[in-house]
Amino acid sequence: PSCIAYNNNQVYVGQGAKMLKSKLQPDQNIWFSFKMNLGKDNGPEFTRTELKEGNPLGKIENTLDATKLFFKKLKTEIDNYIQEQNLPRQLFYSVSIPASFEANQRADLKKALEFANIPINETLFIDEPNAAFLSYLVQANNNGFNNYNIPVDSPLHILVFDFGAGTCDISIIEIGKKAGKLYSKNIAISQFEQLGGDDIDRAIVKEILLPQLAKQNNISVEEIRENNYKKILLPKLQAVAEQLKIKVCKAVASNKVGQELPNLINSTERINFLQTIDFILPKQVMKFENPSISPKEFTDIMKKFTSETLAFNFQDDVESLKSIFTVINSALLKANIEKGDIDLVLLIGGSSYNPYIQTALYRHFDNSDIEIPQDLQSHVSNGTAINSFMANGLGVDIIKPIVSEPVFIILQNEVRKTVVYEGTEIPCKEILIEDLRPQRNDQKEIEIPICVSTKDKILTILKLKSEKGFSTTDKITLKCNISHDKLITFRAFIQNLEISTEPLNPFAN
């Protein structure tokens, strides 16, 4: 898991850090689901951090810091293992990331990897759903995928549903035959949305646990200050909500009949978290004894996350609430196919253990095969290792990656000019944007916003410079290259002479 902790003057990452979740304070000495905030330039985010500038172990003052330290610690552990096991020292890396990660997020991730001295190559990144599918392919003899026939004129469409703690990622993969050869490629990736199991936990806190806490302390919810809720109550209550969610899901799953949810989902019997929690607020101390939830209350919350008709799109810095079908529909729309065209739905990610999610997908994709592996959380890591072997060892790219969102420049009068269309296979040929002209004579700098998806998401601002000044007769050509890892570079020319370009810091998302 994307988790890093600081405890007893030691830094922990992954599962070791996650095990400390209930003992530590979020954004103070434990950080999780932080990768979703990469690509933002918010300055110092974690004002209460215990890892400040000057700490010999490193600093965590924002998301990029957390990511840098995460990979640095991971790299150290890998190097130690290689040395202990006396393995070859020449290493090649493959890193799995959310498929819907945009270029600015990938650029930040690359910075973190460079900080950790992890070597960068063209095939470093693989989208998590694609990695999961690679693992699934390798295990085809055990999971029945080898029973599929692939007609020449009718390729298979596989929808990989990757639902984790902080992400809901959809990748639609096409497998077909062309010129007697088998091919596989991405045809769509869902739009980036901040949706995951953590959002279910936050909904439990706000709708169930917060009213209980207020009642036990003889106050109203309205009397709880927003700042105290965000910084003190929510972090602790979210961990409790996660445990209650797991308890309800296990009870419901064990009583399922086929793929239908049991009558237990309407039960009002309380499921308890047997513990007393103290909250020290600036002006009072609050106690919370045995937080609880009923299956019916949890069912009401899950209806919102699995609604096919309601478009939940409420979002602020505390919570984001969307249905999983918001994400699914965005991928189907991009692929220009109907749900009935999907042959197989493959579930991946820890939050896919949720029986409400599974049942919702069975009902929605009623003409598709649904595959739920026993281990939902290992396929991504296994597939990433397979990708590293295939790409670094054999030079083979099994699934052709695509651009998930259009990239465009903004010209005079807010005119948009598309540079890269969504769905473009990458790496692609160099893209030329020709016949751009300065707006006035003697202009020494020209700024061109480069956007992804919408004009509100600025990837970077390209600054063109000329010491003698531009002329309105100058014909400017931009040359764009996009790598296998979806990282974009621009160069500018006037009459075949390259001119100085300088990217400004983006403020995306």
Question: What is each stretch, according to the model?
Answer:
Residues I150-V152, A214-A239, L244, A251-A253, ...:
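Acidic, glycine/GT-rich loop-and beta-edge segments that sit at the periphery of enzyme/chaperone cores
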Residues G43, A140-K185, L347, I476-F493:
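Gly/Thr-rich phosphate-binding beta-strand-loop-beta motif of the actin/hexokinase/Hsp70
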Residues S184-Q194, E222-E226, N367-I372:
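Short beta-alpha connecting loops at secondary-structure transitions
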Residues P1-A5, K178-K206, E498-N509:
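Short glycine-rich, Thr/Ser-proximal phosphate-binding strand/loop in the N-terminal lobe
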Residues K35-D41, N55-N62, G196-T359:
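Gly/charged contiguous loops adjacent to phosphate- or pyrophosphate-bearing nucleotide/cofactor binding elements
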Residues T123-F161, H379-V396:
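Conserved phosphate-binding catalytic cores of ATP/NTP-utilizing and phosphoryl-transfer enzymes
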Residues P1-A116, I200-G258:
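Phosphate-binding loop and its immediate beta->loop->alpha context
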Residues N117-A131, Q358-A385:
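Conserved phosphate-binding/catalytic loops in two-lobed NTP-binding clefts
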